[in-house]
């Protein structure tokens, strides 16, 4: 089993299948189908991310360089967590965007959902 250690943003443990993206993760585009149409399989809707497009992200360890896109990232992650549609964890190779991190932090405080964020 591969173990990662890094700067913890939201603590937790994660044992899950990894999904690896070589490009940035557009939070809104990736979760649009789950949020708008109730896709319970949580398939990535970002057509500009060939590594993740149409892959189920539910309960997976997302290995990403960084988040990209608009300022909605935090709210999208909070909403995904509050609906229990989140990945098991998100591992970032670059510094984590504070707006995106805020969504996971708020979900950790305000809900019973957990989304660990680690900068490796």
Residue ranges and their predicted role:
Residues 2-15, 19-117:
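Feature captures the catalytic cores and cofactor-binding loops of soluble hydro-lyases/lyases
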């Amino acid at each position: 089993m591969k173990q990662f250690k890094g700067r913890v943003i939201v603590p937790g443990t994660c044992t899950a299948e990894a999904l690896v993206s070589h490009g940035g993760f557009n939070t809104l585009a990736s979760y649009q189908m789950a949020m708008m149409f109730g896709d319970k399989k949580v398939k990535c809707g970002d057509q500009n991310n060939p590594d993740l497009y149409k892959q189920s992200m539910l309960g997976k360890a997302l290995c990403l360089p960084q988040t990209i896109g608009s300022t909605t990232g935090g709210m999208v992650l909070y909403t995904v967590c509050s609906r229990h549609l989140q990945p098991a964890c998100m591992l970032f190779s670059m510094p984590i965007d504070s707006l995106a991190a805020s969504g996971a932090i708020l979900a950790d405080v305000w809900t019973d959902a957990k989304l660990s964020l680690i900068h490796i």
